[in-house]
């Protein structure tokens, strides 16, 4: 009996230490990125770095506004496309589809969610970019190469749809069947039950799923690097090229680091991305607590 108690205590202490180590690792990452960013922060005002649009490292101009705008445009467009599609797919597969259909869709979603991002990038380069250039852009502008915010948003949305559908399906499955049956027994239609019972009960989990998808979208590198155009400009529309922060880091780190402050500028870009993801997750936790109340 004493051995079992001791074993439980040791297991609890080990799990506690692992939890502390995980939190400490995040803190180390943040501190490390901040220290590496300190040279550029000591020479330029933070507000100027965030609001200037000129990116000319050779001339000592480090404006991060184009990269922040590009990241925001691609992420927002991807979520706007993926969220309604994923939600409707999950509702159909959970509430309406036959069990045999779900049997085949589940493995397919897992496969799509696990595909390397470079495959999505190649697909976007071969299909989405020419489609935007030849069929969409001519309706609104005189010329577009196709390497645009729209192409990046479409590719990113396709990447996160399998993830969102899988998460939504698991969340909907966890809603008690008793609640569904009680709603139906009171005369509600199936859609009314879904709208007023299932979706309302699943709201906290859905918020967490969207934040997870946002985090993946913000950190995506290879796919956006291949389809967004990588021009350091502030996009005026979805048919302009953009340069998200992950693409900036992947495209330039290891090159031109002899330029003064270039290494520090890229580390500051990484710190910005880290900060945005952390704030996003903390904000989602606050929203979840409010929703649960």
Language model features by range: what are they?
Residues 1-19, 284-293:
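Transmembrane alpha-helical segments of polytopic membrane transport and secretion proteins
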Residues 111, 164-168, 184, 190-228:
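Transmembrane alpha-helices
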Residues 43-62, 120-158, 239:
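Membrane-interfacial helix termini and adjacent extracytoplasmic/periplasmic loops
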Residues 2-9, 13, 34-78, 98-99, ...:
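Periplasmic/extracellular loop-to-transmembrane helix junction in inner-membrane transport proteins
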Residues 134, 139, 224-274:
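Interhelical loop and adjacent transmembrane-helix boundary motif
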Residues 27-31, 83-91, 108, 119-122, ...:
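Membrane-embedded alpha-helices of multi-pass transport/permease systems
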Residues 169-177, 184, 254-293:
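C-terminal transmembrane helix and the adjacent membrane-cytosol boundary/short C-terminal tail
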Residues 3, 77-109, 130, 284-290:
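Transmembrane-helix boundary motif in ABC transporter permease subunits
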């Amino acid at each position: 009996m004493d051995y079992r108690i001791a074993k439980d205590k040791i297991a609890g202490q080990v799990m506690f230490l692992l939890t502390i180590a995980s939190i400490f690792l995040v803190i180390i990452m943040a501190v490390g990125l901040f220290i590496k960013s300190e040279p550029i922060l000591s020479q330029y005002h933070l507000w100027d770095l965030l609001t200037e649009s000129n990116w000319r490292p050779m001339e000592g101009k480090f404006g991060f506004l184009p990269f922040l705008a590009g990241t925001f445009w691609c992420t927002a467009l991807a979520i706007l496309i993926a969220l309604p599609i994923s939600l409707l797919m999950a509702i159909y597969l959970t509430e309406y589809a036959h069990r045999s259909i779900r049997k085949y869709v589940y493995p397919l979603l897992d496969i799509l969610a696990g595909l390397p991002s470079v495959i999505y990038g190649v697909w976007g380069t071969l299909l989405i970019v020419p489609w935007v250039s030849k069929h969409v852009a001519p309706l609104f502008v005189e010329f577009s190469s196709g390497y645009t915010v729209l192409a990046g948003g479409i590719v990113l949305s396709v990447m996160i749809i399998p993830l969102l559908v899988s998460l939504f399906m698991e969340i909907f499955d966890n809603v008690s069947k008793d609640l569904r049956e009680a709603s139906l027994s009171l005369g509600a239609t199936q859609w009314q039950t879904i709208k007023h019972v299932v979706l309302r009960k699943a709201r906290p989990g859905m918020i967490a799923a969207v934040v997870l998808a946002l985090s993946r979208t913000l950190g995506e590198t290879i796919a956006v690097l291949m389809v967004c155009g990588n021009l350091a400009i502030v996009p005026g529309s979805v048919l302009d090229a953009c340069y998200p922060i992950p693409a900036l880091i992947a495209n330039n780190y290891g090159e031109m680091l002899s330029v003064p402050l270039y290494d520090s500028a890229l580390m500051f870009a990484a710190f910005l991305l880290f900060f945005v993801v952390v704030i996003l997750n903390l904000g989602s936790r606050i929203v979840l607590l409010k929703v649960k109340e």
